Swiss-Prot record:
GO CC annotation terms, alphabetical: plasma membrane; proton-transporting two-sector ATPase complex, catalytic domain
Function as written in the Swiss-Prot or TrEMBL entry: Component of the A-type ATP synthase that produces ATP from ADP in the presence of a proton gradient across the membrane. The B chain is a regulatory subunit.
Protein name: A-type ATP synthase subunit B
Keywords: ATP synthesis, Cell membrane, Hydrogen ion transport, Ion transport, Membrane, Transport
Amino acid sequence: MIMPGMEYSTVSKIYGPLMIVQGVKGVAYGEVVEIETESGEKRKGQVLEAREDMAIVQVFEGTRDLDIKTTRVRFTGETLKVPVSMDMLGRIFNGIGKPIDGGPEIIPEDRRDVHGAPLNPVARAYPRDFIQTGISAIDGMNTLVRGQKLPIFSGSGLPHNMLAAQIARQAKVLGEEEQFAVVFAAMGITYEEANFFKKSFEETGAIERAVLFLNLADDPAIERIITPRMALTVAEYLAFDYDMQVLVILTDMTNYAEALREISAAREEVPGRRGYPGYMYTDLATIYERAGRVRGKKGSITQMPILTMPDDDITHPIPDLTGYITEGQIVLSRELHRKGIYPPIDVLPSLSRLMKDGIGKGRTREDHPQLSQQLYAAYAEGRSLRDLVAVVGEEALSETDRKYLKFADRFEREFVAQRYDEDRSIFETLDLGWELLAELPESELKRVRKEYILKYHPKYRKRGE
């Protein structure tokens, strides 16, 4: 319960999600504000800017129906905090942390600042160990590592929501002794999308190990600034207080950035690239950099932010700045989507910079690093030959070239493509990779050691059996 502090009735202006309060004293940046209307309705806000005798307040539930003359504003002297408890697992909340699943209010074990506790860089442990998503194009080619931040770059109309739900449902760490949880935060989604996520989690039982925060498209845009921070605060609590391995999925970060731009425009700030605020890089970093591991703690926070690239432009400020902060990207392809391939992950522009630290002997399998390199090289060769065929025709190709073409087609249809309910183990993924490489002459497998070929290639494996 917010304790009453200094109260004012000196609102001078309301515009967009913001209000200006005059004649204030001792107000601090980030301070929580309680706003009361003439009818007694209460809303929350936060100080966005504090000057000597004036404060700009962002109102989380929106400024609709607020009257300058009758609105009262109470400055609480506290920062914005979220109540946390293990009872949050299995629950669904709105964008500012209120239950929307018909269940009771959370009885908090603690209240944590939504901006998180400062973390000394020296205290960080290097991200290691494999997280299995059950999706071959990620596990085999762009492996997710505990403590990593690996975004998914999508486009409007591509099935990133299905992919997010599938990852949230299937993700696990190898080893039964590890406790795993998913914190899922959606920003600016439609009712249809919200129902899809609820249904996906509830019908599969994944809700039991998950916490959902859903900010809808018709909720005030200002709430989208708070939603990912609420989710990450809960994730930090589960990871560092209860030693859980937590996967945080944030979708759609483009909606978050649009809300940031809306607030910046309302404050009449000087715009940066394409109208986004000049501090967007720093703001995104305050979210993405909350992933990681801490020395002396068993838990970890792994992030998979999802963003839709406007006009499929990977140089747009949102994916561009995200790429600078994060450790790779998973890129969804419209061309693969048109072919009916799900998930339409294009492995060539995709990258996991920390993959090498989470795979190999003792983590996945000894042949994984070299196998993924060989698959990547063979698929790249097949893709380049497709362009050549469009010019000279398939008749001009050698027999080996035709095999590369066939490999590329099979790679997309059999390795990348899988059912929405298909959960492949890492060993199934690696064995499937070898099955596809059997399409090529053995002399072309130049990136894999001979000992691995003799051990895992289908020709020798079947002979050994």
